[in-house]
Swiss-Prot record:
PROSITE patterns in the record: RBFA
Keyword flag Cytoplasm: yes
Function: One of several proteins that assist in the late maturation steps of the functional core of the 30S ribosomal subunit. Associates with free 30S ribosomal subunits (but not with 30S subunits that are part of 70S ribosomes or polysomes). Required for efficient processing of 16S rRNA. May interact with the 5'-terminal helix region of 16S rRNA.
UniProt record, GO biological process: maturation of SSU-rRNA
Keywords: Cytoplasm, Ribosome biogenesis
Family membership noted in the UniProt record: Belongs to the RbfA family.
GO molecular function, one term: ribosomal small subunit binding
Lineage: Bacteria, Pseudomonadati, Pseudomonadota, Alphaproteobacteria, Caulobacterales
Entry's localization field: Cytoplasm
Gene this protein is translated from: rbfA
SUBUNIT field: Monomer. Binds 30S ribosomal subunits, but not 50S ribosomal subunits or 70S ribosomes.
Protein's name according to its UniProt entry: Ribosome-binding factor A
Amino acid sequence: MKRHSENKKSGPVGPSQRQLRAGELIRHALVDILREEDLVDPALAGISVTISEVRMSADLKHAICFVEPLGASIAPQVEREPSSPSRTVVVPGSPAEVVAGLTRLTKFLRGKLAKTIDMKFTPELKFLHDETFNSATYMDRLFEDPRVQQDVRRLSDVAEDEEG
Protein backbone atom coordinates (compact mmCIF):
# COMPACT_ATOMS: atom_id res chain seq x y z
CA MET A 1 0.00 0.00 0.00
CA LYS A 2 1.61 3.25 -1.12
CA ARG A 3 1.62 6.28 1.12
CA HIS A 4 1.20 8.59 -1.85
CA SER A 5 -0.27 7.77 -5.21
CA GLU A 6 0.17 9.73 -8.39
CA ASN A 7 -2.63 11.76 -9.94
CA LYS A 8 -2.01 12.73 -13.57
CA LYS A 9 -3.44 16.23 -13.20
CA SER A 10 -2.33 17.39 -9.77
CA GLY A 11 0.74 15.26 -8.97
CA PRO A 12 1.16 13.30 -5.74
CA VAL A 13 -1.97 12.61 -3.74
CA GLY A 14 -1.92 11.44 -0.13
CA PRO A 15 -4.46 9.40 1.79
CA SER A 16 -8.03 10.67 1.79
CA GLN A 17 -9.64 12.30 4.80
CA ARG A 18 -11.73 9.14 5.21
CA GLN A 19 -8.61 6.94 5.34
CA LEU A 20 -6.94 9.24 7.87
CA ARG A 21 -10.03 9.34 10.09
CA ALA A 22 -10.48 5.54 9.97
CA GLY A 23 -6.78 5.03 10.70
CA GLU A 24 -6.96 7.23 13.79
CA LEU A 25 -10.13 5.48 14.96
CA ILE A 26 -8.42 2.10 14.68
CA ARG A 27 -5.22 3.37 16.29
CA HIS A 28 -7.11 4.67 19.34
CA ALA A 29 -9.13 1.45 19.61
CA LEU A 30 -5.99 -0.73 19.39
CA VAL A 31 -4.25 1.37 22.05
CA ASP A 32 -7.23 0.85 24.37
CA ILE A 33 -7.29 -2.90 23.65
CA LEU A 34 -3.56 -3.28 24.27
CA ARG A 35 -3.81 -1.29 27.50
CA GLU A 36 -6.87 -3.05 28.93
CA GLU A 37 -6.49 -6.65 27.76
CA ASP A 38 -4.26 -9.28 29.31
CA LEU A 39 -2.26 -10.41 26.30
CA VAL A 40 -0.94 -13.93 26.72
CA ASP A 41 1.89 -13.81 24.19
CA PRO A 42 5.30 -14.05 25.93
CA ALA A 43 6.82 -11.56 23.48
CA LEU A 44 4.49 -8.86 24.85
CA ALA A 45 4.79 -9.70 28.55
CA GLY A 46 5.76 -6.59 30.48
CA ILE A 47 6.33 -4.50 27.35
CA SER A 48 4.46 -1.30 26.54
CA VAL A 49 3.79 -0.83 22.85
CA THR A 50 3.31 2.49 21.09
CA ILE A 51 1.14 2.50 17.98
CA SER A 52 2.37 5.57 16.16
CA GLU A 53 0.33 5.36 12.97
CA VAL A 54 -2.27 3.24 11.20
CA ARG A 55 -2.40 3.51 7.41
CA MET A 56 -5.61 2.37 5.76
CA SER A 57 -6.09 1.04 2.24
CA ALA A 58 -8.49 2.96 -0.01
CA ASP A 59 -11.26 0.39 0.57
CA LEU A 60 -10.63 0.44 4.37
CA LYS A 61 -10.25 -3.35 4.44
CA HIS A 62 -6.53 -3.41 5.25
CA ALA A 63 -4.66 -1.55 7.97
CA ILE A 64 -0.90 -1.32 8.43
CA CYS A 65 -0.10 -0.56 12.06
CA PHE A 66 3.30 0.96 12.83
CA VAL A 67 4.43 -0.02 16.32
CA GLU A 68 7.39 0.67 18.57
CA PRO A 69 8.02 -1.08 21.89
CA LEU A 70 8.78 1.49 24.57
CA GLY A 71 12.33 1.25 25.78
CA ALA A 72 13.44 -0.69 22.71
CA SER A 73 17.07 -0.31 21.83
CA ILE A 74 18.51 0.64 18.48
CA ALA A 75 20.50 -2.60 18.53
CA PRO A 76 20.00 -5.08 15.70
CA GLN A 77 16.72 -6.96 15.81
CA VAL A 78 18.17 -10.29 14.74
CA GLU A 79 21.40 -12.09 15.54
CA ARG A 80 23.27 -14.91 13.90
CA GLU A 81 23.10 -18.13 15.86
CA PRO A 82 26.68 -19.07 16.94
CA SER A 83 26.29 -22.77 16.14
CA SER A 84 24.77 -22.09 12.72
CA PRO A 85 25.85 -18.75 11.18
CA SER A 86 23.29 -19.01 8.39
CA ARG A 87 20.40 -19.15 10.89
CA THR A 88 19.12 -15.95 12.51
CA VAL A 89 17.52 -15.66 15.93
CA VAL A 90 15.18 -12.87 17.03
CA VAL A 91 16.57 -10.98 20.04
CA PRO A 92 14.22 -11.13 23.08
CA GLY A 93 12.47 -7.80 23.68
CA SER A 94 13.45 -6.50 20.26
CA PRO A 95 11.01 -4.71 17.97
CA ALA A 96 11.02 -7.74 15.66
CA GLU A 97 9.89 -9.99 18.51
CA VAL A 98 7.14 -7.55 19.52
CA VAL A 99 5.90 -7.33 15.91
CA ALA A 100 5.92 -11.14 15.72
CA GLY A 101 3.92 -11.32 18.96
CA LEU A 102 1.34 -8.83 17.70
CA THR A 103 1.12 -10.73 14.42
CA ARG A 104 0.36 -13.94 16.34
CA LEU A 105 -2.43 -12.08 18.19
CA THR A 106 -3.91 -10.51 15.04
CA LYS A 107 -7.05 -12.65 15.06
CA PHE A 108 -7.72 -11.86 18.74
CA LEU A 109 -7.06 -8.13 18.24
CA ARG A 110 -9.27 -8.01 15.15
CA GLY A 111 -12.13 -9.66 17.08
CA LYS A 112 -11.82 -7.13 19.91
CA LEU A 113 -11.58 -4.34 17.35
CA ALA A 114 -14.82 -5.49 15.66
CA LYS A 115 -16.65 -5.09 18.98
CA THR A 116 -15.11 -1.67 19.62
CA ILE A 117 -15.40 0.23 16.34
CA ASP A 118 -18.46 0.92 14.21
CA MET A 119 -17.33 0.17 10.68
CA LYS A 120 -18.89 -1.91 7.93
CA PHE A 121 -15.78 -4.12 7.72
CA THR A 122 -13.16 -4.80 10.35
CA PRO A 123 -9.85 -4.37 8.53
CA GLU A 124 -7.15 -7.00 8.25
CA LEU A 125 -4.28 -5.92 10.50
CA LYS A 126 -0.61 -5.97 9.60
CA PHE A 127 2.02 -4.87 12.11
CA LEU A 128 5.33 -3.27 11.14
CA HIS A 129 8.12 -1.76 13.22
CA ASP A 130 8.11 2.05 13.04
CA GLU A 131 11.59 3.17 12.00
CA THR A 132 10.94 6.89 12.57
CA PHE A 133 11.95 6.66 16.24
CA ASN A 134 15.32 5.21 15.27
CA SER A 135 15.71 7.82 12.52
CA ALA A 136 15.04 10.65 14.98
CA THR A 137 17.56 9.23 17.45
CA TYR A 138 20.13 8.88 14.68
CA MET A 139 19.57 12.51 13.60
CA ASP A 140 19.96 13.72 17.20
CA ARG A 141 23.26 11.85 17.50
CA LEU A 142 24.37 13.22 14.16
CA PHE A 143 23.67 16.83 15.21
CA GLU A 144 25.65 16.28 18.43
CA ASP A 145 28.74 15.28 16.44
CA PRO A 146 31.45 17.99 16.88
CA ARG A 147 32.29 17.94 13.16
CA VAL A 148 28.67 18.61 12.22
CA GLN A 149 28.39 21.41 14.80
CA GLN A 150 31.57 22.95 13.38
CA ASP A 151 30.06 22.90 9.87
CA VAL A 152 26.83 24.46 11.12
CA ARG A 153 28.74 27.26 12.89
CA ARG A 154 30.83 27.86 9.76
CA LEU A 155 27.73 28.07 7.55
CA SER A 156 25.98 30.44 9.97
CA ASP A 157 29.11 32.66 10.03
CA VAL A 158 29.11 32.74 6.21
CA ALA A 159 25.41 33.65 6.19
CA GLU A 160 26.03 36.49 8.68
CA ASP A 161 28.91 37.81 6.56
CA GLU A 162 26.68 37.89 3.47
CA GLU A 163 23.94 39.79 5.33
CA GLY A 164 26.10 42.42 6.93
